[in-house]
Amino acid sequence: MDVFILSEVEQGVMTITLNCPDRLNSFNDVMHQQLADCLKQAERDDTIRCLLITGAGRGFCAGQDLNDRNVDPSGPAPDLGMSVERFYNPLVRCLAALPKPVICAVNGVAAGAGATLALGCDIVLAARSAKFVMAFSKLGLVPDCGGSWVLPRVAGRARAVGLLMLGDNLSAEQAAQWGMIWQVVDDAELKDTALTMARHFATQPTYGLGLIKKALQLSETNTLDQQLELERDYQRMAGRSDDYREGVSAFLAKRPPQFSGK
């Protein structure tokens, strides 16, 4: 079987590389399944404290591999919703629910589901040459992989409408100026910058970071009172964690903390 997903665990970081460079790492069914298997490992393995996603070759991910769908214009209409339900929706839900930081290093073009996958990660770093392309509309399709949810939240409604309906290229620099991504770095520095950040997160109190991630997600729909109550509950949970006790002990002893993520 072809290996469309490369994974490596080192120093608490799982690096996942989309590995179909001849197709700009476009998604196919086998890639989806291999990625799902890696994410299950990341969820279950307590030694994995941070996830880093990137692409092989000159692109990050060009979205769905249209050749994999074998759409025959003269045949019956395909059920594209089935692939969304079977692959993309579980992928988005898994990344959102993962109680660990997820970093995306966009090393080239990110189009369609590749763009929305990247922008849905917790922290997005992009090479200076990278581009984001919401290509759905050019095929007569609607955004998937969480695109219609994440775009208004990271770019604002007006820009989300323009990006999704026009389908124009968006440079990494412009995405950073609009606040859609965390940082743009020179192409040659992307890998090292992303890995340094991931290794930093892997040494941090990731139990609390997971609660921060969940609190921010729930803030999208909560009222102020609901969010204040949630902060109370999460602070109670964080205060009972091993990480909090270690952080305070290390501070008082003037030594570096050794967090466990628990």
Predicted feature descriptions by range:
Residues M1-D2, S249-K262:
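Terminal low-complexity tails and localization/encapsulation signals of metabolic enzymes
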